[in-house]
Amino acid sequence: MKKFSLVAAALIAGVALNVNAATVATVNGKSISDAEVSEFFAPMLRGQDFKTLPDNQKKALIQQYIMQDLILQDAKKQNLEKDPLYTKELDRAKDAILVNVYQEKILNTIKIDAAKVKAFYDQNKDKYVKPARVQAKHILVATEKEAKDIINELKGLKGKELDAKFSELAKEKSIDPGSKNQGGELGWFDQSTMVKPFTDAAFALKNGTITTTPVKTNFGYHVILKENSQAKGQIKFDEVKQGIENGLKFEEFKKVINQKGQDLLNSAKVEYK
């Protein structure tokens, strides 16, 4: 069975209008509201308010919506609603939606006891651990000599002076396009994120210090500034309880829906040809 795209499904289903909606565009005399665009892209926005997006992002989404609306208008002009392919695909979509509603009804009947959620957490605490992390900057160059020269330029600097000079040199000399313009900033990472020589060097540093020798990887030679660090720690129950509950609920749902399917199969008259 072919899957309907999010765009196609939304256009077929239509979009609920908000009485307080503001018109953001008109298409062939038809008004387009911010509420329409917001609801249309809701799965993609994942709870983010359309109205708070930067103007360029809002405009891009509005343009996408308009293009889809124009395609819909053109399809109607061509009377494609009577096309056999449309009817066939629509029937498939309706069946899929009906099955989804059926399953959601069952899912909503499943309740997970709070004690069971807590017990799962207590029995699996080793899975809910925040790994040790560091925050660092780096300057990547092609040769060991370049790296040594940079280290010499930074020698003796501390605190804000070191940080500022490091950022300046990163912008000037680093060949890493991903961090160069941010002054070499890499953000936070754990021991599984970077290649081992880089990780080992970064984690071995004290906060606010740089590597005193170049760090060689397959990318070149690095000079690293360790900005901050966080030790390995236990993730609190409140941070993960909703995820645990959802996981347990889904596992129970799979058992229930499989049993339901088996019961229906057993009660049906099925003849294999």
UniProtKB/Swiss-Prot annotation:
Gene Ontology molecular function terms on file: peptidyl-prolyl cis-trans isomerase activity
EC number per UniProt: 5.2.1.8
Pfam family, one: Rotamase_3
Record domain PpiC: where: 131-228
Swiss-Prot/TrEMBL keywords: Isomerase, Rotamase, Signal
Catalytic activity, reaction form: [protein]-peptidylproline (omega=180) = [protein]-peptidylproline (omega=0)
Signal peptide positions (record): 1-21
Disulfide bonds: none
PANTHER family: PEPTIDYL-PROLYL CIS-TRANS ISOMERASE HP_0175-RELATED (PTHR47245:SF2), PEPTIDYLPROLYL ISOMERASE (PTHR47245)
Name of the featured protein: Putative peptidyl-prolyl cis-trans isomerase Cbf2
Taxonomic placement: Bacteria, Pseudomonadati, Campylobacterota, Epsilonproteobacteria, Campylobacterales
Name of encoding gene: cbf2
